[in-house]
Amino acid sequence: MSGGTPRESVAVVVVTYNRADLLDRMLDGLAALTTRPDVVLVVDNASSDHTSQVLAARTEPWLRVTRTEENLGGAGGFALGVRLAYDGGWDRIWLMDDDVVPAPDCLDVLLAQDEDCLMAVREDRSGRLCEKAATRFDLTHPWVIKPKTRMVETDYGTRAAMPERVELENVAFEGFMCRRGVVQRIGLPDPSYFIFYDDVDFAVRARRAGFRIWAVRDAVLVRQLDFDQQHDLAGWKGYYMYRNLFAVHFRYGENALVRAKPWLVALVVVLLSPLRGGRAEARNVIRAIGAARAMRTLPPLSVD
């Protein structure tokens, strides 16, 4: 920061579950930052691998570990971590999954931006841009089945083609940073999502509260695993994908037709299930729409 102004304090929140070796590599990346965070809050979601041994072997004084008694999912882990960061009084809260590694200057680049909501830009291990945060998340038009219609990766193709900052309409909790005032205003991430769309929900709430979100081109975050967004919609993850997608539409659809879209999607899935190889997906979508209706109202998430 220029003019002798002390920099804002930073709490990193890392949520991990059964990926000890990736977590160790990620913590090495945090230790190599040219500007160190003030604290790293690791939420261990009741891992059953050697995560506890990896964490016990770390010697960084800024590392604090909270182990949950059960797996809260990514959503529950981030809700807990953000609560801890907020209660600790740190100025900025930087959210990380356990499979990303920041470039050494990543935190410096983010702290140079005087904005309330920021996103580091992800690339794969070969340096290819793979930032899937949405530049357009359409909750206005009912005929748009998948609301994420544009993203950084498809808009620009390469990091070099990006402007210095790109405005986003949703984020991923892999490199997202916000000031504590954002949490004070809109509350915590919603743990009821368990997995998927908790970051989308938080971004929608932030934007509707008047906060703008910026992806920062030169803040580099390296993803250690390939993206796998083609989940088995007939499996347990498929249930959460449908339920949480429907919940976002029920909560935030900008008109009645968009809020009704989940019913149409569910009907189509059920009707087509005999042609798609079985009825497991149909059972998932029927369960999902009932559960999503129960999520229409945002639960109490205030930090007060």
Locate each region found by the language model:
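Acidic helix N-cap motif at the loop->helix transition within catalytic regions
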Residues: 24, 49-57, 105
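A conserved acidic beta->alpha catalytic loop
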Residues: 29, 44-53, 70, 100
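A short, conserved alpha-helix in the catalytic core of glycosyltransferases
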Residues: 170-171, 175-188, 192-219
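Short, acidic, metal-binding catalytic loop of nucleotide-sugar glycosyltransferases
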Residues: 28-37
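Short beta-strand-to-loop acidic/aromatic patch adjacent to the donor-nucleotide binding site
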Residues: 90-99
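Non-catalytic, C-terminal membrane-associated alpha-helical segments of glycosyltransferases
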Residues: 236-244, 254-304
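Conserved donor NDP-sugar-binding/catalytic core segment of glycosyltransferases
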Residues: 105-138
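Glycine-rich, basic loop-to-helix element that forms the pyrophosphate-binding segment
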Residues: 68-88
